[in-house]
Amino acid sequence: MDKFYLSTIDENAHLLAKKHGFGIEIAEFCTPWFLDTDFAEIDPKIREKMTCSDRFVLHAPFSELFPCAIDPKVRAIAAERYRQVIRVAEGYGIRKIVVHGGYNPRIYFPIWYTGRQTSQNVSFEE
């Protein structure tokens, strides 16, 4: 069961993870502004959930983030949020982060998006 993770989107996921030996996906920061506004409130709850397992992944923010956007300023905002979540993961000792690329077939041509996704135009380095 070492490859299964339960998402904390379900408020009881940590208890089920403990019962069945699963890992936990910390999903509290899927909404980007929680990194800024609600961290102090969320942090102790996350730490409590982390007592129920020894394996974790942190879900990066994804709402309204487009790391492969056409607009370089939009890409810069996404990169900043990812840098934030990398620091948060380090603070929790989490080494795996789930990141969504923001692909929307109604906005991007697949060939253009794939090229952008794999290019050096998206950087998370500070």
Q: Which role does the model predict for each range below?
A:
Residues 1-84, 90:
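N-terminal pre-domain/capping segments
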Residues 71-126:
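Active-site acidic/histidine proton-transfer and metal-coordination neighborhood
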